[in-house]
Amino acid sequence: MLVLPAIDLLDNEAVRLLQGDYSKKTVYSSSPEKMIQVFEEQGATLIHIVDLNAAKTGKSENEKTIKKIKEKCTVDLELGGGIRTIDNMKFYDGLGVSRLILGTVAVEEPNVVEKAVSLFGQDRIVIGVDAKNGYVRTKGWESNSGILYKDFLTTMYGMGIRHVIFTDIARDGMMEGPNTLAYAELLETFPDLQLVASGGVSSKEDLVELYDKTNGKLFGAITGKAIYEGKLDLKESIRILNQKREK
């Protein structure tokens, strides 16, 4: 189980939003590439990046920053937010992004997902499922799709998708712990899903609980605010999970 440090980009700064509310942002750094270098030094092997400008409007304001990050870091990157066309995907593929996260487009144009898997391969396409009160949210969490997340996942799974990031919006940025039950249930329903947990991870104890409650089957867990505010030691958390995996 990997620990994925998260960086959310808004106007070329690293920020965090409270429950996806763009009016409730905290700016953590105006040099996101320096933060990623620190994460890399602490042992992270995969970094989770969200382009919040693109997630909301479909237009990125952060392409130069993403390019700079990739130039300065050797760690793998996964990127989400506003990736809604094959041309978008080709652009980020050209920058060297390892995993492309599709959210809104997967809900509104599932045929694009099929094309993406065909072009880039099953292991490089990740579906971002952002859920609140059981329903999938789109367009930077601002729109309710009216689709139950379990139905949506069943559809994606049937199309060959095996990599999923599931975000519990109600937990995001609240530092209240993750929804471990939801992840355990999803892995029971879809046993070979490479599932990443997102939302609420605020301590190494949360990571251990996720590992234990899913019998080590979780692919990874994303955490951002807890790292920035000193509540989660990234290096120590990675060490603990590595130890558990080796037992």
UniProtKB/Swiss-Prot annotation:
Pathway: Amino-acid biosynthesis; L-histidine biosynthesis; L-histidine from 5-phospho-alpha-D-ribose 1-diphosphate: step 4/9
Superkingdom of the source species: Bacteria
Pfam families: His_biosynth
Entry coiled-coil feature ranges: none
Protein keywords: Amino-acid biosynthesis, Cytoplasm, Histidine biosynthesis, Isomerase
Compartment annotation: Cytoplasm
One GO location term (cellular component): cytoplasm
Any GO MF annotation of the entry: 1-(5-phosphoribosyl)-5-[(5-phosphoribosylamino)methylideneamino]imidazole-4-carboxamide isomerase activity
Catalytic reactions on record: 1-(5-phospho-beta-D-ribosyl)-5-[(5-phospho-beta-D-ribosylamino)methylideneamino]imidazole-4-carboxamide = 5-[(5-phospho-1-deoxy-D-ribulos-1-ylimino)methylamino]-1-(5-phospho-beta-D-ribosyl)imidazole-4-carboxamide
Entry EC number(s): 5.3.1.16
Keyword Amino-acid biosynthesis: yes
Catalytic center residues: 8, 130
GO biological process: L-histidine biosynthetic process; L-tryptophan biosynthetic process
PANTHER family found in the cross-reference section: 1-(5-PHOSPHORIBOSYL)-5-[(5-PHOSPHORIBOSYLAMINO)METHYLIDENEAMINO] IMIDAZOLE-4-CARBOXAMIDE ISOMERASE (PTHR43090:SF2)
Name this polypeptide is given: 1-(5-phosphoribosyl)-5-[(5-phosphoribosylamino)methylideneamino] imidazole-4-carboxamide isomerase
Protein source organism: Leptospira biflexa serovar Patoc (strain Patoc 1 / ATCC 23582 / Paris)
Name of the encoding gene: hisA
